[in-house]
Each structure stands twice: as structure tokens, then as C-alpha cells.
Amino acid sequence: MKQSAALVLAGVLSISAVYAREPADSSKVSIELHTIAATDQVPFWLENNRLGQVNDDLPFQQMMMLNWEETVSDPGKRFVIDYGAVLGTRLGRVSSLFAEQYWGRISKGDFYLLAGAKGEPVWENGLSHTNGDFFLSNNARPNPRIELGAEGFRPFRRNWFRRLSVDGRYAEYLLLDDRFVNHANLHHKKVMFHFQLSKAVTFYTGLDHWVFWGGISPSSQIGRLPGFKYYLRYVLGKSGGEESPETDQDNIAGNQLGQNLFGLDVRTQQYRVKFYYQHLFEDGSGFLFHNMQDGFWGVSFRLLKARPLIQGLVVEFMNTTNQSGPYHQYAPDPAKPDSLIGEGRDNYFNHGVYHSGFVSYNRMIGSPYFVPEIKRGISTGFQSTRIRGLNGAVDGYLSDRIYWSAKAAYSRYYGQYEAPYPRFKELFSAETTIQVSMRHQPVSWRLKLATDLGDYLDR
């Protein structure tokens, strides 16, 4: 059993200043200083969901992050413009300077247009291991994108239909990181329908769809992949054309994957509860729920009382072991080679053409339980895609100025159907945080203790 422990020595020193030029306008600048010291390698909870800031191969590292954000509105208050950047430097055995985020956004009413690289808003104080989204956490450094979206749009204003609101986004990513297929693109669209069942209860359902498309493969059998010419085939989930690889012609164009979304929100004056279920698919069998056992389930609870000892709780479970079954186009009877069974072995987040998998800057875009294999500085996909994981987290306040949280996760890794582990590998991870805010200064100190136990992350 591997054991790894780490202590964040200086934690996070955060200095921020906010000033307003008009009621709707503001500028915010903050500086964060981090020092991480580990006995072996950086533990799971300190490394993940940090937008790729932490280098897990450096037991000792220091970082400085500069955060800048500006909000302005036009004189008529018709548009609101946000823009900002997060720049970082890392000092250690390997030092680096990087631009983590850089973005601009213009909003009008319920609609917005965003351009640049920007992380997702932190949900439930970071207690969720996926930031509440199985496919889009804050685990990886974001690539730049152009995104058109809506938040809380109400298409109907009368009768029962006024209870319906819609969230959506349509985005195209420019993949600037090094990967097996260079100059590839990533398409993303998501729509969520919210139905207010009562004053306190809202049900939602939606669809989340991702596609890797285009690019140049180093494989001589594939080479340059069709680009914008086949754009509608990619975004509509159609089969490839005559210029596509044979596998795309037989199936669908590009690397297509996504999830069906379901949830229930309950909000009272005293508390808020959310139940959520996210069901992943990689092909038609998954979309039709042939892999019903697989998915991501969670519940979050938060007291709305100001600064109680225990304020929030999140419990989540993930399973990806079914993958629509162990057979894919398998002939059980050698005498009947055309009698094939099975549409399984989905091998989530890996792909035969886009070998780097569902990653951004060599980190899983979604659930950090999935850890890519890195060879010569490039992700070659995920060695284990059949995983079960359970995690829980809690937070609250010891006083008005002292915040605390605790997290724990246990996961089992079974490899792939094509390459199963002789015995499952496992990982237990835990972290606790204490943050103290200065009484009269915009400064806070954060101390984190974290540990890993298990054999999965041995290097």
C-alpha cells in the first residue's frame, strides 16, 4: 500500500481589493501565495480541481497567482461586460510561468457571449469532487473557447409554462495544448430545462454533448481529419463522410460523448438540498441506457444560516464498470462468424483516433478519478476506465473568522475490458482545511493537510 502525505506550509495568502466606480461596476485584484511540501507526491485532494495549477511530480513547490477581474456596464445598463485574467508562476525543481485564464464576456439580460479561457464557477465551496459536473469540473487548465449561452431564460410568461426556465451553452474550443492529434477542435453544447414544481421544489433535466473533431493525426493511416466541411456531421452526431476514417464512416464522426442530466432542487428559508444524477454515454447503446448501472449520483445539503459549525455536506458515488457489457460485436459461435452480439466495451473517455482522450493540458476535463497516462509529455488516454468511487465532504465555521472543511474519497480501479487488472487497485484520499481571515484586513491564511493511501497512483 502506498502512503503519501502532504502539508501545505504557508497555505493560501490572499490579498484582495475591491472598489466600485458605479453600482454595477467593479474591479477586483487578488494575490495568492501557495507553498506545498509533500513526503512523496502531491496527494489527490491538493492536486485536483485546481485548474491544473499544481504539478503532481514536484513534492515541494511554491506558487504565486495573480487574479484580476473587471466589470463594466454601458450608460444605458443594456449590456454588462466582464473581463479578466489569472496569471501564475511556479517555483520548484521545474519552474514555469503560465496564463491559467484570460477571458472576456458580454451579457444582455439572460444571454451572454464569452471568448477566452475561463474556469467554471466553484460550486458548494469545492466540496464536490467534480464541481457538480461529471464532464466539466475545474480539474484541468481550460483551453480558449467561443461560447454563446443563456442563464435562466424564460421562454413563456403566462400560465403554468412560466414555471419553465432554460440554461444553455454552445461552444467551440481551440485546443492549444500538446496532444496526439494536433490542431483538433472540441465542440460542446448543453441545454438544461428547469421546471418549478412548487415554490420550494424545482426539477431539471438536460443533455450535455461533446465532440472532438478535425486535426492532424501522426498515424499514416489517418493523417488529416476532415474539418469544417463536415461540421454539421460532427455537431449532429451523424456518421462520417467519404473523407472520414473508416471507423467514423461505420459509426459516427469524431469522438462523441456526453451525458443525460437529471436533478431535483429543494430550497426553503432554512436550507437547500440538491439531488443529481448524471448518466454518461459514448455511443448509441449508452444513449439508450444500455449501461444503466453507470453514472454519477450525488446529494448536497447546505444550511442557509450564517456561519454555523456545520453548514454544507456533499456525498457522491460514481460507477463506470458496466460500459454496456463485456462484449462488442463478438461471435460466440466460431461456426457462425456473422452472428455477433454485444454493443459494450465503451471504454469511456478513450478513443481510437483521438488517443489523448478527454483531457485538457494532460488532465481529465471531468472527474479527477480518471488519471491519464503521460508519455513524452502527451496524454495517451486512461489506463483504467472501469472505476467505482465514493466521496464525501463537509464544511462550516468554528467562528466568524475561521472556516473549516474535511473531504474523503475511496475509489477502486479495474482497468479496461481489453486489459483488466489481475486485482483491482484502490485509492483512499483525505484532506482537511482551516482558513483564518484577518479581522480588519483583506487577508486570509489557509492550512491544508492531506494524505493518500493505496496502490493506484504509484509511479
List the predicted regions and their residue ranges.
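Feature captures outer-membrane beta-barrel proteins of Gram-negative bacteria and organelles
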Residues: 64-72, 99-117, 144-151, 189-196, ...
